[in-house]
Amino acid sequence: MKIIVPATSANLGAGFDSIGIAVSLYLTVEVLEESSDWKIDHDLGENIPTDERNLLLTTLSAVLEDKNVALPAKYHLKMTSEVPLARGLGSSSSVIIAGIELANQLAKLNLTSDEKLKLACEIEGHPDNVAPALLGNLVIASTVAGKTSHIVADFPSCALLAFVPDYELKTVESRQVLPNELTYKEAVAASSIANVLTASLLTNNLEVAGQMMEADRFHESYRASLIPELQLLREIGHEFGAYGTYLSGAGPTVMLLVPDNKLTLLTEKIMEKNLTGHLYPLKIDNKGLQVEESVF
């Protein structure tokens, strides 16, 4: 059995902690065989546990505890990931969704998508990454009084270009630079920008969407000092035809929304700057969580 989960890119500027997209990088978890102990084969580095301390298995345990279910066996697993770690592309969220589905499959829980999303939000804290990892495409979500409401929609047609710096930026570090509160006037302005961003995405107006994502008042201006590449890439985007540029999740990945016919040009112009990192041309993943050879 294989569980496949896409990477995600959250916030899109003004959609802070609420809007996310699934993109074409993937985490794969394969169940190999029963084992005397849990064991995970991976090549993700020495800092990622290979036993029950791994986020995949702590998530599985949390789901089983929530459902008051025990597994009759432990398993040898293989985890492979194209998703860069601690770069703002939802690496932890993809593992959380995989862990929930692993519990769902092995314990035959028959969880609905809504139940999976509820569990994921309880573990992750907010829906902007876990929702598109689970559901694919563009997801706009909010959790109010413990209940997560979400809308899934087709993302406007365009290419995505992700610049992934070689340095990590932990979400907790990126959140430390945010203000504790906004004034009422600031909150109204930030909310209105987010409203227009949402409407423009849902009506396929990428020109307006790009303007609104770059006008964010919630987080990007506070985080910009942590990611020096953001402003440079935004300027390149303006000069060579990108719809918009935003900080993916908590960073440090910078994402550009690009007309398909400008992707090659923008890639070349960014590569000319010799930035330390990697460029990924990406597409929207419209499937979300996938299971091959389900145990059901």
From Swiss-Prot:
Pathway annotation: Amino-acid biosynthesis; L-threonine biosynthesis; L-threonine from L-aspartate: step 4/5
Record Gene3D superfamilies: 3.30.230.10, GHMP kinase, C-terminal domain (3.30.70.890)
Cellular component annotations (GO), alphabetically ordered: cytoplasm
Annotated positions binding ATP: P84, L85, A86, R87, G88, L89, G90, S91, S92, S93, S94
GO terms of biological process kind: threonine biosynthetic process
Pfam family, one: GHMP_kinases_N
Localization per Swiss-Prot or TrEMBL: Cytoplasm
EC number: 2.7.1.39
Keywords assigned: Amino-acid biosynthesis, ATP-binding, Cytoplasm, Kinase, Nucleotide-binding, Threonine biosynthesis, Transferase
Catalytic activity: L-homoserine + ATP = O-phospho-L-homoserine + ADP + H(+)
Gene Ontology terms, MF aspect: ATP binding; homoserine kinase activity
Leader peptide range in chain numbering: none
Main location class: cytoplasm
Disulfide bonds: none
Superkingdom per UniProt: Bacteria
Family that this chain belongs to: Belongs to the GHMP kinase family. Homoserine kinase subfamily.
Function field: Catalyzes the ATP-dependent phosphorylation of L-homoserine to L-homoserine phosphate.
Protein name per the record: Homoserine kinase
Provenance organism: Lactococcus lactis subsp. cremoris (strain SK11)
